[in-house]
């Protein structure tokens, strides 16, 4: 299936869900943890995100992640992040389940984001539970020397170490985010998987929930995945796909379906008239885009 056919299915979805992985963030310049320049090439890789090692010597984590995790502000959301945010604002996308910890979906403007592996947005004291914001931790680390000892890492007034709300090996996934992701997958009539090889569970099981519930799954990833044979379509170039999706507007058929759905829930004639007017404006805008593909509004 060609990319434009996948895009038609995505735009026409009644309840679109998206699962994103590292391939989305590499477009922003963030190294894939498992890539050639990734964190897992670090000799301490197995210990960096291990909760037992963190409690034993938190400097292993803070030294290993100082550049990648605490330098995230230098990266900007990619075209893919921005496109997904637009789809949410248009009411097509119902939510994003992401394996990424970089918070770029939120910076792009997405609101319904479920971080199934957590994120460093908040840090909590391992002793008393007090929370500190990511920006505070970054600011503190900027005052420290190049190499941290266990005593140099961010600590609470009680003496406890601040740990990011990233899921470490040996910890359970954040229950609220993962349950919400499962519900999102089950309700979706279309799930779009972008930038993940679907090998890390339990997040990799989310598209299967969509399939089991009767929905369709489309995959955009540069390498094969275990679900390729079960997907309704597959594309490989994430950047190209994102660009095409960004410039695609709903066709008349999908607009008409949306209009009828809206009117069926409205009893007040004034509201009905307003809904019809809004849809006609959107249709005229779509025609304008088709006639002038170079228009910035397209």
Give the residues covered by each predicted segment.
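Conserved catalytic core of sirtuin-type NAD+-dependent deacylases
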Residues: 1-248
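Low-acidity, Ser/Thr- and Arg-rich intrinsically disordered low-complexity segments
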Residues: 240-242, 246-298
